[in-house]
Amino acid sequence: MRICYLGPPGRQARLQAFAGPETEVIARKMVGGPESVESVYEEFLSAALLMDEVVALEREGFDAVIPGCFGDPGVDGARELVRIPVIGPGLAGMMTACLLGHRYGIVAPLEGDVRPTETLAIHHGYDQKLAGVRPLGVAVLEMNSDPAETLEQLAGVSRSLIEQCRADVIVLGCGTLSFRAEELQAAIGVPVVNPLRAAIKLCETLVSSSLSHSKRSYPMPPKLVAVASRGAR
């Protein structure tokens, strides 16, 4: 099984460690994409690039694709274009959290990420169990500048979600933050979901079960069907 992760460079080994022995995870950077996604504008930029990427990846023989952003930019559109699973970390993280507790909280990078994250939960149908979304207050590109300080801040925000919002589970709402999940879980004593790991495991489950998204939900755009039909004549 081959899964392509489209996101920031330098994550190949860590992502591969999350996968099973029969799975190969290939990490690639989307050419022309933003260095980080911290606004709706940047989500739209990433979404447009994802469309071309997924078609090429399916032709290349990949079994599943994971866009490397918690906001799941472009996932719905990409599913219309291909038949292989396209799994967003946001969806995978929220779904996993709902299996582990009655209410879950999300730690987002910045204040500006809170509303889009809440909207994402509504879009995926996981808003009923969402206890709250709180910002870490650290930009994505600065999260690794002081790992100890970032972990301390993560623990503080997570505890506020647990104590004030009654969250039973914490989801790390950023791909860069996701690699701190095990440390944070040890520090705060509740399950902490790494959305990238959850996405890889969900891809493995779907592919090994010969399942993918329904084309009744995500049909090929009619204009593209018409073009393909003309080309086949």
Model-derived features with residue positions:
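Glycine-rich, highly charged phosphate/nucleotide-binding loops
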Residues: 39-56, 149-157
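N-terminal glycine-rich anion-binding loop in soluble enzyme alpha/beta folds
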Residues: 1-48, 109-147
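Short, glycine-/small-residue-rich phosphate/pyrophosphate-handling segment
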Residues: 98-136, 152, 205-233
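Beta-alpha junction/loop-to-helix N-cap segments that form part of ligand/metal-binding clefts
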Residues: 50-77, 81, 174-178
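Non-catalytic positions within long, well-ordered alpha-helices that form the structural scaffold/packing
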Residues: 58-61, 122, 162-163
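Hydrophobic alpha-helical
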Residues: 67, 71-74, 155-187, 200
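C-terminal and late-domain segments of enzyme folds
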Residues: 4, 173-179, 191-220, 224
